[in-house]
């Protein structure tokens, strides 16, 4: 799929290479991040800056794989208004439900409310809770929210409500 074929409201799923991205993929599936496209910009929740918008070209410099999915019944104007409403909110580092701020798929599910929550998983091949997540939550001083309701990028991408449009190429 070419950049010029992107439509407002398209979801872009990515595979990042950071340690937390690898832990997310190990626990949940092939994608570690999701963002939404509007007017040549990307809206998403980031570890570094919380909920932000940035130029598509800047976003694309950060990632390797960009798979595009579309929700055909989207009311793009309404979703865009909700997307802007949350700009500046902090990142939800705890992944706990009803926390201040958003993690990436939580933000998308909030502004495009067509996705169900599922019990959150934090395991890997051998452990119910991976070593990475045990250390992550130890540093936060919190219990791992295992089986708490949440979302993840791979789960959103698997929704029957979305249509896969292809891998994004310039």
What positions do the PLM features span?
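Cysteine-nucleophile amide-bond enzymes
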Residues: 1-170
